[in-house]
């Protein structure tokens, strides 16, 4: 009997380039066991709430899946024996979640803004471009 689950796993930040291959491996495991993936989100590198193995960032991946217990056990086992996976969490859900998560929605909204370094550079240029204030009435402002 298939049940719905939400799975989040954190990958070591040095292994971020391996994440697409890991996702493909887990997808084939789920779909090979007649499971369904309702939502798959790669959140990228994010700040951790507390250090894990002296790391402050990790690569987050979210899956909403519908699988039976045998496939779920195999998936959890593969998380456990993969040294790159720092943490994993499996939550049983009542039904499928297919809409975009809040984290991805906020990420999309932030995506419209320029990068922080780009904003800083632009702000610095605006300050440099502003004409210097000149004393028009002839007396010094120091006397005030």
UniProtKB/Swiss-Prot annotation:
Q: Which SUPFAM superfamilies match?
A: Ribosomal protein S6
Keywords (alphabetical) are: Ribonucleoprotein, Ribosomal protein, RNA-binding, rRNA-binding
| Sequence ranges of Basic and acidic residues compositional bias | 105-124
| InterPro entries assigned | Ribosomal_bS6, Ribosomal_bS6_sf, Ribosomal_S6_plastid/chlpt, Transl_elong_EF1B/ribsomal_bS6
Instruction: Tell me the GO BP annotations in alphabetical order.
Output: translation
Region described as Disordered: spans on this chain: 97-144
GO annotation, cellular component aspect: cytosolic small ribosomal subunit
Q: Which GO terms describe its molecular function?
A: small ribosomal subunit rRNA binding; structural constituent of ribosome
Extract the NCBIfam families matched here.
S6 (TIGR00166)
| PANTHER family linked to this entry | MITOCHONDRIAL 28S RIBOSOMAL PROTEIN S6, SMALL RIBOSOMAL SUBUNIT PROTEIN BS6M
Give the family per the record.
Belongs to the bacterial ribosomal protein bS6 family.
The record describes the protein's role as: Binds together with bS18 to 16S ribosomal RNA.
Q: What is this protein called?
A: Small ribosomal subunit protein bS6
């Amino acid at each position: 009997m298939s049940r719905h689950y939400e799975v989040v796993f954190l990958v070591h930040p040095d292994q971020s380039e391996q994440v697409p291959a890991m996702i493909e491996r887990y997808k084939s495991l789920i779909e090979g066991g007649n499971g369904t993936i309702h939502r798959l989100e790669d959140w990228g590198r994010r700040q951790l709430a507390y250090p894990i193995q002296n790391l402050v960032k990790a690569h987050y991946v979210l899956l909403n899946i519908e699988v039976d217990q045998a496939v779920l056990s195999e998936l959890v086992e593969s998380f456990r024996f993969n040294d790159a996976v720092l943490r994993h969490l499996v939550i049983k859900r009542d039904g499928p979640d297919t809409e975009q998560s809040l984290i991805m929605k906020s990420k999309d909204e932030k995506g419209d803004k320029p990068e922080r370094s780009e904003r800083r550079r632009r702000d610095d240029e605006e300050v440099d471009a502003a004409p210097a204030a000149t004393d028009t009435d002839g007396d010094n402002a120091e006397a005030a």
